[in-house]
Amino acid sequence: MIQPDGSILGLDYSEERIRYAKQHYAQESSIDFQIHNLRDPLDSMGLFDLIWVRFFLEYYRVESPDIVKNLIAGLKPGGHLCLLDLDHNCLNHYELPTKMEKILFELMNRLEKEYNFDPFSGRKLYAYLYDLGYQDIQLDLRAHHLIYGKIRDEDLFNWIKKVEVASMKTEELFEDYPGGHDAFFADFTKFFLDMRRFTYTPLILCKGMKPLFP
C-alpha cells in the first residue's frame, strides 16, 4: 500500500483499540498508531498523501462537515481523501412486521436527534468533497450487509447486539410493543432466522483529490 520510504499512521481515540493495533500490526517500522480524536486538527502530524476514514462520521452528525475540513488541512496538495460510511443504516429489511419496523425507525430517529448518530451519513460524503472544491471525485456503492436465505451465526449475533445496544438508550420506545422489550427482541430474532427475510445496508465510498492550488 505504501512506496519505499513511506509510512502509515493509524489514529483512534480509544486507548484499548490503539493498544490492540500496536500489539498485532505494528511489527513493521513503517506502521505506527497514535491516540487522536479526529474532531481535533491534525496539525502536529504533518501532511499526508492519503487520508482514509471509515465508519467515523456517522457518530458525529452535527460535526461531520467540520471534521472533513480538519482532515483536508492535513492533506498535501494533490493528496486524496477517502471517506467510507453506511447509508440508511439498520433500516433496510423485508418483510419486517409493521410494528417492528416502526420501532426501528423511531429508534434511529431518536439516536439521530439525541445522540448525534447519523444513519444517513453515506449519502452526504459526495457533497462534503464537492462543496470544498475537491477534484476527480469518484464514488462506489457496495453492500456492507447482504443477507438472504440462511443467516450466518456471526451476522445474527451482530444484528441483535447492534439493536440491543441502541435500544438501551431508548427503552421507553418498547412500552407499547406487545410483550415489551423482551418480546421485541424475540420477534426480531425470529425475523432474522426466517430464510425469506432480506436485509441489506449500502456502503458508500467517496474519494477526491485536494486541488494543487488553492
Residue ranges and their predicted role:
Residues 21-22:
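Conserved SAM-binding loop
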Residues 65-80:
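A short glycine-rich, Lys/Arg-flanked "PGG" loop and its adjoining helix->strand segment in the class I
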Residues 27-40:
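Conserved SAM-binding strand-loop segment of SAM-dependent methyltransferases
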Residues 82-151:
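Conserved catalytic/acceptor-binding region of the Class I
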Residues 39-51:
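A short acidic, Gly/Pro-enriched loop at the edge of an enzyme's catalytic core
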Residues 14-16:
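Conserved SAM/SAH-binding beta-strand->alpha-helix loop
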Residues 48-65:
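A short SAM/SAH-binding and catalytic strip from SAM-dependent methyltransferases
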Residues 140-197:
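C-terminal helical/coil "lid" or tail adjacent to the Rossmann-like core of SAM-dependent
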